[in-house]
């Protein structure tokens, strides 16, 4: 039996969930923006009607409103999106246990052996679409192929543009349908890689596919090899339900509301990020021994900042121990330029069961205190108990507690 893999993608996911929750908005263009009160906020999602007017995700709200002035603008509700995403996963699991989340609104399915129960691939796709629509009010588009990359490209380049929302891209159809497309339509090719390819005279997927592998590997190494295979629809990776289960690191970052220029202000946010990282580590019963921090400025055209890591004395999930390492890195490598984004990561993980008592300090007490604080926050909210520094003007703890994934709950 030929392998059949689906890429199931939700149409304008955030906007679709908002519309399903607010039937009174039916028929009106809808935009989801991080901060509707600020015209400088960015578009997180736009309904198909707004997209047809030229609105794109990531553009400024005021620009979108010029293109679609009658659009209703709503604030995102990330907790609701997460809930619906989980609900959709449960729907997909009725058809196969081989489900691999790709993002909050995209999932791979291997339905190879589901055909005996649910019919041909297109029939299964239609049943999946109907179930998702009836239970969530969200429309799904489904790309089909014998590999994950074929399914992904079938979805992005064809299914999203078809009334049925379903498209099967076989290897036999690649040369006729996929290869004439611009090189940027190839999965894995971003803006920078598009420039590189175009400078080399490679403007279509077919031109890449027909370029010798030796030339591609010689110029772009392993990444070029992978893209050449993708252009041929070759991807041996299976749909793996638990591929994201084992964590290699626990990180947390945030974009600041304005440039931070004072070291004492940056230290406040750095401590709060370490608090969040350690809370997540304790929740997973993990400890880490390598701490890394990354900082950057607001101007992406002329990047500033650094990314450095160091090994700690012990595996830990104690906030102050991780913070001491992060603070050391910051003081050592910060050049004094304004900072707009910070990130803290804890890696080299091991089980919390390996905790070693220290008879010459207060490590065990601090270790238990962390879990006690977590229990209080779980019961009464993240702002129920805070460090004193979180009451300073530089603190972002209270604002961050209102958000999931950087957006309001």
Curated annotation (Swiss-Prot):
Subcellular location: Cytoplasm
Cofactor(s), names only, from the UniProt record: Mg(2+)
GO CC annotations, alphabetized: cytosol
GO BP annotations, alphabetical order: DNA-templated DNA replication; error-prone translesion synthesis; SOS response
Catalytic center residues: 106
EC number: 2.7.7.7
Residue ranges that the Swiss-Prot or TrEMBL entry lists as coiled coil: none
Site (Substrate discrimination): 14
Cofactor note: Binds 2 magnesium ions per subunit.
Binding annotation for Mg(2+): 9, 105
CDD domains: PolY_Pol_V_umuC (cd01700)
Pfam family membership, one: IMS_C
Reaction equations catalysed: DNA(n) + a 2'-deoxyribonucleoside 5'-triphosphate = DNA(n+1) + diphosphate
Any GO MF annotation of the entry: damaged DNA binding
Keywords annotated in UniProt: Cytoplasm, DNA damage, DNA repair, DNA replication, DNA-binding, DNA-directed DNA polymerase, Magnesium, Metal-binding, Mutator protein, Nucleotidyltransferase, Transferase
Gene3D superfamilies: 3.30.70.270, 3.40.1170.60, 5' to 3' exonuclease, C-terminal subdomain (1.10.150.20), DNA polymerase, Y-family, little finger domain (3.30.1490.100)
InterPro entries xref list: DNA/RNA_pol_sf, DNA_pol_Y-fam_lit_finger_sf, DNA_pol_Y-fam_little_finger, DNA_polymerase-Y, DNApol_IV, Rev_trsase/Diguanyl_cyclase, UmuC
Residue span(s) of domain UmuC: 5-190
Major subcellular location class: cytoplasm
Oligomeric form and interacting partners: Monomer.
Family affiliation: Belongs to the DNA polymerase type-Y family.
Function description: Poorly processive, error-prone DNA polymerase involved in untargeted mutagenesis. Copies undamaged DNA at stalled replication forks, which arise in vivo from mismatched or misaligned primer ends. These misaligned primers can be extended by PolIV. Exhibits no 3'-5' exonuclease (proofreading) activity. May be involved in translesional synthesis, in conjunction with the beta clamp from PolIII.
Name the UniProt record assigns to this protein: DNA polymerase IV 2
Organism field: Halalkalibacterium halodurans (strain ATCC BAA-125 / DSM 18197 / FERM 7344 / JCM 9153 / C-125)
